[in-house]
Each structure stands twice: as structure tokens, then as C-alpha cells.
């Protein structure tokens, strides 16, 4: 395993903001023909603190970072596969616009419901609900960054 990582390279330090460096390494490994071995006994966790309303501005900021780093990923691997991974397709753009009713469901309109869910012990449900506008924000940011960079 060490030899394979040395051959394809470690995490790319060009990913200096949040997002995609792990999947980009995986894409390089996949392209060299490394076989995926599933190990159901292996467990991994992504720990996130319970959602609070104070976290929302940072979560929105992270979506902008993910958009910028998504383009770093796409420039390295300009494939349809990577477009789908980073949600850089018109299908994704349409999906998140529809699911948020064109932005009517957003971090502001959801705030009372999010507050209620958090107050009543459902911060996880609140976070899942907040993912709708966050995904819309992220996909819009990705398309905006791509336009500024001259990518389509």
C-alpha cells in the first residue's frame, strides 16, 4: 500500500480549503487500476458537533470553499465522473433549485423550524433539512466560480 501511495502521490496540497482532496486521491488511485477492497468490519466516522444556528454562516462559507476546491478537482480530472461527484452538472443545478423551490426554502426561511428542531432535541434532523439550501448554495457557487474561471 505504501508503494502505491508513493507512486500516485499523497494528498494534493493544492486543496488548501475545505473539500475533495480525499476523493481526488481516490480518483488517482482508481485510474492506476488499484482494486477497491471492501471491508465491512472497518468503521470510519466523520464527527460533527450538533447543529446550532450560530454555525450556519460558517456552513455557508464552507460551501464556497467546496466550490473552489471542486474546480481544482475538476481541472485535474475533467471527466463526466468528476462532474457528477462535485455536482457540476445542469441536472444538479436543476435538482437543488427544484428542491428549494428556487431558493424560497433557504437558511432564513428555515430558521424558525431549525430552531424548533434543535430546541426539541433534533439537531441531526435540522442539519439534514439545512442541507437542502446548503447544496443549492454550493452548486450555485460552483457554477459561478466556473464561469469566472472560463470553465463550462
Q: How does the language model describe each region?
A:
Residues 27-29, 47, 102-106:
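Juxtamembrane/interface motifs at transmembrane-helix termini
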Residues 61-65, 82-152:
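Non-catalytic, C-terminal membrane-associated alpha-helical segments of glycosyltransferases
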Residues 23, 47-48, 92:
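Short secondary-structure boundary/hinge segments and terminal tails
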Residues 27-30, 64, 71:
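Short, well-ordered alpha-helical packing segments
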Residues 3-9, 14-43:
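A short, conserved alpha-helix in the catalytic core of glycosyltransferases
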Residues 20, 57-68:
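Non-membrane alpha-helical structural segments and their capping/turn regions in soluble enzymes
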Residues 16, 35, 39-57, 69-73:
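Active-site donor/metal-binding and catalytic loop motifs
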